[in-house]
Swiss-Prot record:
Key component of the proton channel; it plays a direct role in the translocation of protons across the membrane. Gene3D superfamilies: ATP synthase, F0 complex, subunit A. The lineage of its organism: Bacteria, Pseudomonadati, Pseudomonadota, Alphaproteobacteria, Acetobacterales. This is ATP synthase subunit a. It is found in: Cell inner membrane. Keywords: ATP synthesis, Cell inner membrane, Cell membrane, CF(0), Hydrogen ion transport, Ion transport, Membrane, Transmembrane, Transmembrane helix, Transport. It holds the Pfam family ATP-synt_A. It comes from Gluconobacter oxydans (strain 621H) (Gluconobacter suboxydans). GO terms for cellular component: plasma membrane; proton-transporting ATP synthase complex.
Length: 249
């Protein structure tokens, strides 16, 4: 939030070099920094939670096992018999997004999933891997998906371009969905936090009025916790669906 009474809800998304002059030289901003932090957090969580495996698991081990089983079941049940092959990729995607969403809720942190460059990069990676999987499992036969079975020949000039556009739009819709949800949630949190600070500066009466935006901010934070995991889940399951289509014969 800027000085005075102005609420700068979009300032939180600005990129600035970190690590001083080294960061400026390397163009190293908060986004890659928090990506590294997120990766480290997930790796530590899994390493500490899974090693050594106790007969009676503790809370951390139970959480790690539940997380592993959840994503594994999601990949296998959605993709099918080849689900185990793509499980590591789906697992990495899910936890990279989840960690980014949740880290962004901490004070003085940065939400890298609120940047379209990041979400589009993830979506393009999913898109390319799904194409490579299509070629690997179906060969040139994957082109038949652009003309549904039983379609009259005279409809082909109309349906094929529509199917191609729909296929090419996947990374766009996948990236915008995550990006828009993260931006909207954090803007609302910043706005109501700004209202709270502004009202608190009005004296005793302002302190009373500040109760409402504080309550709203608490509710929004709880909602963001839910949205954070839901968006990671939606991205992961859509990835699984695209991969299922890619490996289907």
């Amino acid at each position: 939030m800027a000085a005075g009474s102005t609420i700068d809800a979009l300032g939180q998304f600005e990129l600035h070099p970190v690590l001083g002059h080294l960061g400026e030289a390397l163009r190293f901003s908060q986004s890659p920094l928090f990506m590294l932090i997120a990766a480290a957090v997930v790796l530590v969580f899994l390493y500490v939670g899974m090693r050594p495996a106790a007969v009676v698991p503790g809370r951390l081990q139970a959480a790690a096992e539940i997380s592993y089983d959840f994503v594994h079941d999601l990949a296998v049940s959605t993709i099918g018999e080849n689900g185990a092959t793509f499980f590591p990729f789906v697992f990495a995607i899910f936890f990279f997004i989840l960690a980014g969403n949740y880290l962004g809720l901490l004070p003085f942190s940065f939400t890298y999933t609120s940047h379209i460059a990041v979400t589009f990069g993830l979506a393009i990676m999913v898109f390319i891997i799904s194409i490579l999987a299509s070629i690997r499992f179906q060969g040139v036969g994957f082109l038949k998906h652009f003309l549904p079975a039983g379609t009259p020949v005279w409809l082909a000039p109309l349906l094929v371009p529509i199917e191609i556009i729909s296929f090419l739009s996947r990374p766009v819709s996948l990236s915008i969905r995550l990006f828009a949800n993260m931006v909207a949630g954090h803007v609302l949190l910043e706005v109501f936090a700004g209202f709270t600070i502004m009202l608190a500066g009005l004296g005793a009466f302002g302190h009373v009025l500040a109760i409402a935006p504080i309550a709203i901010n608490i509710a929004l934070t709880a909602l963001e916790l839910l949205v954070g995991v839901l968006q990671a889940y939606v991205f992961a399951i859509l990835t699984c669906i695209y991969l299922r289509e890619a490996v289907a014969h």
